[in-house]
């Protein structure tokens, strides 16, 4: 059965991916999951420099489930490009890199580094706190989201997915601010 899909001009063999943050870059699960069967791997967030993440405990049981607060622990873009991208390239799956940052210049530094890497898409995590916006989630302001997205689209050579925060009264305002810059990026 053909389950292929085209997402932003990228042909996937199937529409199955893992959510960012749940799968690392796949190495942790390679002995348990056939990565070749996934349409894509969406990596854990990567920043311009390594982040230690939150102190432990990071997971707590709550009524009806559990909560976690990992804090976007990651190795930083340099080690990610050196170690994680080559690991993922050995598999027959698309690579979506989740990009995180505290400020626009941090996001842009990671996007610039990834632009020439052999990846298929970028997912920009704009629900991270932003030091330049009074510690509000960057993705809660339509103007900030639109401005950052436009800057990223000028640099990225891969399609860009904006990971919107659900922590807003009306997410449609944020989404609508991106419509005029939503055309796929294509660089020669």
Across the structure, where does each feature detected by a protein language model lie?
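N-terminal capping/small domains of soluble enzymes
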Residues: 1-95, 101
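Surface-exposed amphipathic alpha-helices with a cationic face
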Residues: 5, 81-89, 115, 149-156, ...
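Conserved radical SAM core fold
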Residues: 47-52, 126-138
């Amino acid at each position: 059965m053909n389950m292929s899909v085209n997402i932003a001009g990228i042909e996937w063999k199937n529409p199955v991916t893992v959510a960012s943050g749940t799968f690392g870059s796949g190495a942790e699960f390679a002995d348990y999951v056939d990565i070749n069967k996934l349409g894509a791997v969406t990596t854990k967030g990567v920043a311009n420099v390594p982040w230690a993440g939150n102190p432990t405990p990071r997971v707590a049981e709550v009524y009806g489930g559990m909560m976690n607060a990992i804090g976007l622990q990651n190795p930083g873009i340099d080690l990610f490009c050196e170690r994680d991208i080559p690991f993922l390239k050995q598999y027959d799956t698309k690579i979506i890199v989740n990009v995180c940052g505290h400020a626009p210049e941090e996001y842009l530094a990671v996007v610039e580094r990834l632009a020439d890497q052999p990846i298929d898409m970028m997912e920009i995590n704009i629900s991270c706190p932003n030091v330049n916006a009074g510690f509000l989630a960057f993705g809660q302001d339509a103007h900030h989201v639109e401005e950052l997205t436009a800057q990223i689209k000028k640099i990225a050579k891969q399609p860009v997915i904006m990971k919107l925060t659900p922590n807003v009264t009306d997410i449609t305002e944020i989404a609508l601010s991106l419509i005029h810059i939503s055309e796929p990026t294509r660089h020669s």
